[in-house]
Amino acid sequence: MIADTDWGTQVWHATDKVRMAKFQEVLKEHFAQPHLPRHLLPMLKDAGFTVKKVDGIVMMTTEIEPYVIGITKLAGQFIAGRHGITGGDVQEWEADLSRLNETGEYFYSANQYLFLIEKG
């Protein structure tokens, strides 16, 4: 089984939409193939695998929880210092997410795809 997230499916609500879009674009640089799932079927077939099943899981939350705290911290560490994004920008973003959480407006979602495969 192969599991991977297509980072183009990520929805992360923030008050500053322009900043959020920039952060998400810069974060994609962290991944060798941020959109791998949409290209994986032909790659697997070309490598001699049979794809038995493909399924998806929506990872979604309407409140800040440990998984999202981890993603937020890792994202902030990666994007700070890239493309003009400062540590202060990241702190403002984190504060915005916290405010949205406090007011019940927080929303995060991303799709993970599962490929059940066998050789031959």
Where are these regions (language model features)?
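General N-terminal targeting signals
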Residues: K17-R19, Q24, P66-I71, A110, ...
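Short coil/turn segments at secondary-structure boundaries
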Residues: L40-L41, D89-Q91, S109-Y113
